[in-house]
Structures are given as C-alpha cells and as structure tokens.
Amino acid sequence: ISVIELDPNRNILRHQKVIEKPYHMSYPFVFRERGSYYMIPETASNKTIELYRCTEFPDIWEFDRYIMKNISATDTTLFYYNEKWWLFTTLDQTGGISGGSTELFLFYADSPLADKWVSHPLNPVVSDESSARCAGNLFIRNGIIYRPSQDCTIRYGRGFYLQKVTMLTETEYKETNEKKIKPEWKKDLKGTHTYNFINGLTVIDVYTYHRRF
C-alpha cells in the first residue's frame, strides 16, 4: 500500500510505500475514529480482514487487529448509518472458483473497532457478479444511500454501478441498480472499477493496454 501526495493542481509531489506484506494488498479503505485514522486493506490472499492504525499521518501505519480470520474477503467497506457500523464485503466460499466477486455479505456492530461483528440474517444480501463487489465508499446524496459496485461480468473491472440502497436494517437489505458507468469517456480505455470522492476531489480508476514495442 502506498500514499501519493498531490499539489492543488493535482500534480504528484511524492509517493511512498506505507505498508508492505508478503501477500497481496489493495483497496485501502480509510476512515477516522476516536481521533485516529484507520485502514482496512484487502488481504484476501492471507484469509483475513485486517485493521491498521495510523500513528503518523499519512506515512506510518501499524497493525491493530484482525477483524476476521480464516475468510476470503474482498474489498471490505464500512459505512455508518442509523447508529450502527455496517461492514460490506464479498466472500469467496468456492475455494477460488468465483474469484470473490459474486456474493455480497453484510455485518454490523456498534463500533468500527468492535471485536465481533454480527452477520446479517439475509446473507448473502446480493448474489450477482454484476453488482456484488464494492467499488468504493458508500455515500448519501439527497437523503439516498448509494453503494458503488463493480461489474465483474465478462471480466474483472469491466465497469461499475451506483446502487441505490432502499433498505438497510438489522433484518432487511434492499438495493436497486441506479446508474452504470462504463469507461467510455476516452478512447482506448478498457475498464474502471473504483469510485470515491471527498472534499471536492473525485477519484475514478481506469485501465488500458499499451504496446511494449
């Protein structure tokens, strides 16, 4: 996991590695709680959901705890709503056949630093490779909850949806496809699978192919 610092014109000032492990890490979900920054990176290849605490922002992060172990979870995302913390994650229970993009599981707790998370009774709350896997932070716009989700049909990172969450309680969960975003705004783009924004800055990733010769 690395950090990149930008100037006001979005030019890169520096980049620095902040967490390195002998297994794959990606999708760094960052949040603030009790005056500290925390991060949940994807560590599915280690069969864990891990929590890190920042001791010197943004460069120094220390392992805090395992949120869950013996679990193949991808793109874990937290969301605070109605005095509960909700944990969204896609679980691969097929031994790697599904790739961890088909089933969305939901858990909840009173604190993001909780030792135990309660599994939602409707799990998996979504079973659809076109919309199960999270693509960024959930957000509220005009009173409506939106969940960015990856479209993993045909290939990984094909595009993403904005899902409208219409019901989120300890016993119910409902969402509908609101809008699909494809990488069509520039020639030669092949895919996009992450959407986030904060303080007026929107970040969308894309990938393309380049000839090496």
Which residues fall in each region the model found?
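Carbohydrate-active catalytic/glycan-binding domains of CAZyme proteins
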Residues: 1-213
